[in-house]
């Protein structure tokens, strides 16, 4: 599974990203994480100081999924959103981005 952020909107802010109980770390603009996962349903969550958003993504054996995390306009601080995207869109964003440092 690839989780990425590509927009320059809100570039001064990073957003925290987690998959289930696993905290991956922060995504800045044009960065991505790649994680190996077992087939099942995963709760993907992004968090900013003002809000959070989550989506459930089901992954079958052998599938590669792409999930975009995006900054959205907030009242005082930015908000975030996560959503699955088509493989073509996800691959093109990952190719031009940089791998983010995952928290261990």
Give residue ranges: language-model regions.
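Short loop/turn and low-complexity linker motifs enriched in small/turn-promoting residues
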Residues: 1-104
